A protein has these predicted regions:
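Acidic/aromatic/glycine-rich contiguous surface patches that form carbohydrate-binding/processing clefts
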Residues: 194
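Extended intrinsically disordered or low-complexity regions, especially N/C-terminal cytosolic tails and loops
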Residues: 1-186, 198-273
Length: 273
């Protein structure tokens, strides 16, 4: 009844109730926002079926992007572990002298302990506690870092290390890479917690090199530009990610509005590598 009271057209009450049992009303109500007028009422002739399809589009879109971020995250782990292990040794990350002046080593060690405690039942953790007195090489401990922790770890390295990683691995500046890691941490968290991407404005506007296409809004498109720059395999980005992204958009193109995810008309050309 709440759906009908707002003016949405419900063609099948049974299907509507069934859907609401899967997606609770509070979560679903956020998808009403694009159809709300300034006075709080809603536009006429909007079907509940369209709301459902936008909801499903958002869900599938999160799936595509989450898989993409996972690929980026695994690559970042590998690169940070290899670099720091090569330059500072397997346990060098425990030495506060390798970090910059903003680094809070006590906080960092507490975060490491949290990582270990949260994974205390892992065979890897048990093995290193029993055999190596709880000393974890960088390439082991980093596997338990969250995306936010990886971003924090990079931001606290010495400037020379930051520059090398940004330039040699990601072909960008330190400022851009720091910004990008913060952005994908936020995006990853939204995807992981089933949060809405459609008609959503992100807090951070990613920093882009001067020669690049700069995002003009805080919608999803600006975040996907970041994924494009960080994705480790150019060929796979075009053949897999872009194919999946286009398929989801084409499936729901009659119900969604690209402007609500910040996509320009030439979005495919801008995102292709």
């Amino acid at each position: 009844e709440l759906i009908k009271e707002k003016g949405f057209i419900v063609n099948n009450d049974t299907e509507c109730i069934s859907f609401l049992k899967q997606a609770n009303y509070y979560r679903l109500s956020a998808y009403f926002l694009p159809f709300r007028k300034k006075n709080g009422t809603y536009f006429a002739d909007i079907s509940f079926n369209r709301i459902q399809r936008i909801y499903k589009f958002d869900s599938k879109l999160r799936g595509v992007l989450f898989n993409c971020i996972e690929r980026i995250e695994l690559h970042l782990r590998t690169q940070l572990a290899y670099y720091c292990g090569h330059v500072y040794g397997s346990l060098g990350y425990m030495d506060k002298s390798i970090y910059n002046k903003k680094h809070n080593h006590d906080k960092f060690r507490k975060l490491l302990n949290v990582c270990i405690e949260e994974n205390k039942n892992s065979l890897v953790v048990k093995h290193h506690k029993e055999k190596y007195d709880g000393k974890f090489p960088i390439w082991v401990i980093i596997e338990f870092f969250s995306m936010g922790m990886l971003s924090y770890f990079y931001a606290d390295l010495q400037s020379g290390d930051q520059k090398y990683i940004a330039k040699e691995i990601y072909d960008t500046s330190v400022a851009c890479l720091k910004s990008w890691l913060r952005c994908i941490t936020d995006l990853r968290n939204r995807c992981a917690h089933y949060s809405r991407l459609y008609y959503w404005s992100f807090t951070a506007l990613p920093k882009m090199p001067k020669e690049s296409v700069a995002p003009q809004n805080r919608k999803l498109f600006s975040q996907i530009l970041v994924l494009k720059r960080l994705y480790p395999d150019k060929k796979e980005w075009n053949s897999k990610v872009m194919t999946e992204l286009r398929a989801v958009i084409e499936e729901y193109e009659d119900d969604i509005s690209l402007k609500h995810i910040g996509f320009p008309q030439d979005w495919y050309e801008q995102l292709e590598r």
